[in-house]
Amino acid sequence: MSINSITSYLGISGRNFIVFILVGFFAIQNLAFQIIFRLNIPYSIDFSDVFSPVFNQIVKDEFSLFITKGIHIILFPKLISYPNFYLNSFDVVNLTYIYWIVTSITLFVMYLMIKQTDKRLFWTLIPISAFLYNPLTSSGYWMVGMLSWYFPMLGITSIIYLLNRKTINLKIFASGVSLAIFSTFSILLGVVSWIAGITVLLKAVSEKRLENKKWILLWIISSIIVGFCYLFLTYGTTDSETHFEVLFSFTGFSFISNFIASSFRLKFEILMLLAGTL
């Protein structure tokens, strides 16, 4: 069977077929890496933050799902880990497969986002998948601890896709709020999901794609309610004082800009600031 007949059967262009093949290659080689080596290393930099509480929950019957790491509430990674630890004798190999599934779903949502906006950008899935499935950055050592970081990635990506539609109903909105809560209670970085959601909604209103502005108000109310719940759960859980005023200083701006531009690895700080700002 020729490539032309395959692409005709699938209803995609030859260029997109090449993108599909390359993305599939990166995904398969990463999964093969996990299956062949089965790196069951029950330790990572975030082990004590995610798995020690789960261990105490099972062994000592201590309710520890809401135990915080500083001001991080790593709830959903613990909920995912709990049945695996309990039923699988604390083997963490299965969690590396969950990482692969989460990454693949995120990449698929990115595909839907591109299809929703500009199909000419399908080629960007190649470098994105190369980074996400790179064994050097997703080894068995890091995968287990990285679940708490990849959950917000999935949540934020899905929120942007859902709220960027021409029409928003209660079901779509509730799904967006649920994903934002999922991201927020996976790690503190997940609060960005609320910013992503309001940004998409405001953009839709400015472009006159969203006539009913009640969704913006409901999104703000939801974020405030969840924010108060988060502060209630984290209040008094850390010995170090939290200085929120720093966020509104140049130091806070510099930190956020450098964080956004971290993937560029620029040599000078001023370049990182410019990249993060732009």
Name every feature range the model reports, one short phrase each.
Residues 97-124, 158-162:
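Transmembrane-helix motifs of polytopic, lipid-linked glycan transferases
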Residues 81-85, 95-109, 148, 152-155, ...:
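Transmembrane alpha-helices of multi-pass, membrane-embedded glycan-processing enzymes
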Residues 4-5, 192-228:
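Perimembrane helix-loop-helix junctions
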Residues 123-154:
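Aromatic- and kink-enriched transmembrane "portal" helix at the membrane-lumen/periplasm boundary
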Residues 172-199:
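Membrane-interface alpha helices of multi-pass inner-membrane proteins
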Residues 43-94, 227-278:
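Membrane-lumen/periplasm interface segments of multi-pass, membrane-embedded glycan/lipid transferases
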Residues 151, 156-173:
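Membrane-interface transmembrane helices that cradle and orient dolichyl/undecaprenyl
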Residues 1-30:
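Start-transfer (signal-anchor) and selected internal transmembrane alpha helices
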